[in-house]
Design a protein with these regions (language model features):
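N-terminal Rossmann-fold NAD(P) dinucleotide-binding loop
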Residues: 91-92
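Glycine-rich Rossmann-fold phosphate-binding loop(s) that bind the pyrophosphate
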Residues: 87-88
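Rossmann-like adenosine-cofactor binding region
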Residues: 110-204, 220
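Phosphate-binding beta-alpha-beta segment of Rossmann-like dinucleotide-binding domains, i.e.
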Residues: 24, 32-81, 96
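Phosphate-coordination loops involved in phosphoryl transfer and adenosine-cofactor binding
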Residues: 3, 78-81, 152, 161
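An N-terminal-biased, well-structured beta-alpha scaffold segment characteristic
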Residues: 1-29, 132, 151-153
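C-terminal helix-to-coil terminal segments
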Residues: 22-23, 27-42, 56, 67, ...
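A short helix->loop->beta-strand "cap" motif at the edges of active sites that frequently abuts
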Residues: 2-5, 24-27, 103, 160-162, ...
């Protein structure tokens, strides 16, 4: 066969049958470096949105309302603790941004990168410690087998009023457990760019007033798409 390689313009390989490709001698590659800045910035944007009611307040105004008192109890990010689950390129970018605005940052990853704690001033901690200490939790791990990383059991270990951000893979967060926690107030708000089903079908979740949502646009910037194109050319030129 002349079919030698599949290149995914982005990070995730969810829409590629990797095992089939491997069995048939077809290489599968992606462009993991290119979208990091854009995805990290979107995660940060969702953090601000959740802290200050930006999404729901804007929607309210478009309905002709002026609900200043309803959205008068926002919170600052400065001084809060951000826990990053998955400390690869995107997690590291977000960690640097968060530290720059005065947040305390901790990280969990099953793989520890030598020297990165000292370089960034961001310590690795165990998952339970991250859950207990974090005011904001942002997920940047690849999809995992065996269930969601953020499930009902782990949400129960979080601070009351925690904010959860997911710009990684929709299956990393148990949507039913998240919705229950939003309704109970255990979770203050959630910022979501990815969903278990895409296009998203969980209307109750993405229409919740305390959910800041976007339709999987993490890498959808002019700059990221330009870098992805360059990375594609680089990969092809080395084949």
């Amino acid at each position: 066969s002349r079919f030698k390689c599949v290149i995914r313009a982005g990070v995730g390989l969810d829409n590629i049958d990797v095992q089939y490709a491997k069995d048939n001698g077809i290489e599968v590659k992606n462009t993991p470096k290119s979208p990091s800045e854009s995805v990290a910035e979107l995660a940060m944007a969702h953090m601000f949105s959740c802290a200050r009611y930006i999404s729901i307040a804007g929607h309210s105004m478009r309905e002709g309302k002026w609900e200043k008192k309803a959205y008068g109890k926002g919170i600052e990010l400065t001084g809060k603790t951000l826990g990053i689950v998955g400390f690869g390129r995107i997690g590291q970018k977000l960690g640097k941004m968060a530290k720059a605005i005065g947040m305390n940052v901790i990280a969990f990853d099953i793989f520890h990168i030598p020297g990165i704690e000292e370089e960034l001033g961001i310590p690795y901690v165990e998952m339970d410690e991250l859950l207990a200490k974090s005011d904001f939790i942002s997920v940047h791990a690849p999809a995992v087998d065996g269930g969601a990383l953020i499930n009902a059991e782990r949400i129960a270990k979080m601070k009351d009023g925690v904010v959860i951000i997911n710009t990684s893979r929709g299956t990393n967060v148990d949507e039913a457990a998240l919705l229950d926690a939003l309704n109970s107030g255990k979770v203050r708000a959630a910022g979501l760019d990815v969903y278990a089903d895409e296009p998203a079908t969980n209307v109750a979740l993405y229409s919740h007033p305390m959910v800041s949502c976007t339709p999987h646009i993490g890498s959808a910037t002019v700059e990221a798409q330009g870098r992805i194109g360059e990375e594609l050319v680089e990969i092809i030129s080395k084949m």
